[in-house]
Design a protein with these regions (language model features):
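Basic nucleic-acid-binding interfaces
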Residues: 1-132
Length: 132
């Protein structure tokens, strides 16, 4: 496993992000998903984020990515949702017929940390530190 680093730290931070279309409307197809993925990659460069995996269903996307410890996740996610919403509606006008208001994405999102050792292994390791 290769760790990432910067001037003051060594890290390996993987995140699993799930973004849902407003009202769970069935709007995603392969073309729109590829378009949204390209936007994610372009914007992520400014936030020290690297895309690892992307997949979609008709009403949501799953995104696995790596980030630096100083990355402002909420700021990045909101910037992505705002930009992608605007550009998807512009370049895929058929989407407007399926959504009642201006927003493309649901207001909420699911962000999970992932990778590394299972939680039970880490918990046991921490519990046993005082025994050494």
């Amino acid at each position: 496993m290769k760790l990432d680093s910067n001037n003051h730290s060594v890290f390996l931070l993987y995140y699993h992000l799930v973004l849902v279309v407003k009202y769970r409307r069935n709007v995603f197809d392969d073309d729109m998903s590829d378009y949204a993925k390209d936007m994610f990659v372009r914007l992520s460069e400014s936030y020290n984020i690297t895309l690892v995996e992307w997949n979609h269903d008709v009403d949501h996307v799953h995104i696995l990515f790596k980030a630096h410890p100083n990355t402002e996740m909420t700021k990045f996610i909101n910037a992505y949702k705002s930009a992608s919403s605007r550009l998807i509606k512009r370049d895929f006008p058929q989407v407007k017929k399926k959504l009642w208001k201006e927003m493309f994405w649901s207001r909420s999102f699911c962000l999970l940390t992932t990778g590394g050792s299972p939680i039970d292994v880490v918990k046991t390791y921490i519990e046993n530190q005082s025994e050494k």
